[in-house]
Amino acid sequence: MPRYRGPFRKRGPLPFRYVMLLSVVFFILSTTVSLWMINGSIKPVLMDIGEMETKRIATEVIQDSIEDYMSDSENMKDMFQMNSDENGNLTTIDFNTQVVNSVKTKVTKQLQAHLKEMETHTGHSGASENIMINIPLGQVTGNSLLGNLGPKIPVRFNLIGDAFTDVKTKIKPYGINNALIDISIFVEIKVKVIIPFASKTAVVTNNVPVSIKAVQGEVPQFYNGSGGSGVTPSVQLPSSKENGADSKKEKSSK
């Protein structure tokens, strides 16, 4: 026999504790998804801005370090010594390794000092305070029209740097038996910009000339300027002794 069902009873509203629990769960999920979307959209913008700011600060560190060293450094002529023969003709050029290593050490110390100021934010012009960037929330949309809308989110950058230096010498020949000596300091700075849950390293290099000198050697009596692979003709010139003997003969004959 079919069972008789009584009248359908409508259920009442959910208890308050269930409503509160569902609201909290929904709020946590929606907040997590929103933060994940915002972070994914803003992170590339933050890293690009941080890299540009890092390169700017690293360039200032190099310039200030070289300027501080050049203002207090010893005479750059001591970096190389030119040796001549008894006739005053240039024979060899010797580089003073002690002075070269001293230059490298002093510049490295200057760079490390400025990088330390940059990391601790105590005194370097351009890094006197933490780098703070305010990104509009409209950057999340990726739309140029809406990019400047919404509240601005402050993001703080931290910087960590390391420096490498080397003294390079180049000798470039020019003219006839002439040379141009170029002594420069190669500087490489690696600065890592750190934001919450992300980091990126920027490398800045610079080659700073510290001493340039033109050296003129003895002009040869014969010069093959063609540079070809042909046979070089042999030209024999009378020596000074032979010229003196010939002149004496001419005087005696007269």
Swiss-Prot record:
InterPro entries: Sporulation_prot_YunB (IPR014197). Disulfide bonds: none annotated. Residues 243-254 have a biased composition (Basic and acidic residues). Residues 226-254 are annotated as: Disordered. Residues 231-242 have a biased composition (Polar residues). Required for sporulation. It is found in: Cell membrane. GO terms for cellular component: plasma membrane. One of its GO terms (biological process) is sporulation resulting in formation of a cellular spore. It comes from the Bacteria. This is Sporulation protein YunB. The gene is yunB. Keywords: Cell membrane, Membrane, Sporulation, Transmembrane, Transmembrane helix.
